[in-house]
Amino acid sequence: MSGMPNAELVREQQQPGDPMGSSAHPNAYVPEVGGLGSELPEAPRDKFFRKMREQPLVPIGSLLTCGALIAASNHLRSGNRDQFNKALRWRVGFQGLTVLAALVGSFYYGQQAAATIPAPASSSADAPLQQGAVTTLPGRAPTVWQQTRADERANKGRNEFEGRVGQALDRELNDDKRLEEALLGKEEEINLEQLKKTATKPRPVIGQDARRQV
């Protein structure tokens, strides 16, 4: 009779999808958390150079886009409308290539990182751990519930990354649009000033000599 409460407690503490129960091993998920925390975070400088090596077209496209904007502003100051419009078209082309390169690179390296998840050291005791990215006790395969939770975390991280990339691209497009509108507004102001100057000049009357007027 004294063992009945313990048996009921064992059944209550069993997790969904775990037929063997986890009350005998309350720290079954500690290796997974420890494995994630043992990885040192990448330094910002190393991450910057790694991104430069992985996606060289993105910084090159950004520099070309900035160069086209600078050229457009110079042509606007000089009053060359044709070259100004041409520089704006180059800016749009460079920006489109930069966005396309960023999206393709993010998708490619995201798939590559997901396919190359580091697996634990293989041995005869923990061979079942190679079935997925979920770490369990040695000799035990991951349960359906554990695998489902791991897939949910992976999908959530991927969706958050794609959302951040989309927000960054939207901010860049909005900034470029505002800059282009500002440049076009400045060009219209210059044209209005030129029209005002030409309108204020006195026009000579045909057949009338201004020198004879008193």
Curated annotation (Swiss-Prot):
Cited InterPro entries: Hypoxia_induced_domain, RCF1
Entry coiled-coil feature ranges: 177-197
Membrane topology, record value: Multi-pass membrane protein
Any one GO biological process: mitochondrial respirasome assembly
Disordered as annotated region, ranges: 1-36, 195-214
HIG1 domain span: 29-120
Keyword Coiled coil carried by entry: yes
Predominant localisation class: mitochondrion
PROSITE patterns per UniProt: HIG1
GO CC field: mitochondrial membrane; mitochondrion
Keyword annotations: Coiled coil, Membrane, Mitochondrion, Transmembrane, Transmembrane helix
TM regions (residue ranges): 57-73, 88-109
Superkingdom per UniProt: Eukaryota
Compartmental location: Mitochondrion membrane
Subunit structure: Associates with the respiratory chain complex III/complex IV supercomplex.
Role according to the record: Cytochrome c oxidase subunit which plays a role in assembly of respiratory supercomplexes.
Family: Belongs to the RCF1 family.
Protein name: Respiratory supercomplex factor 1, mitochondrial
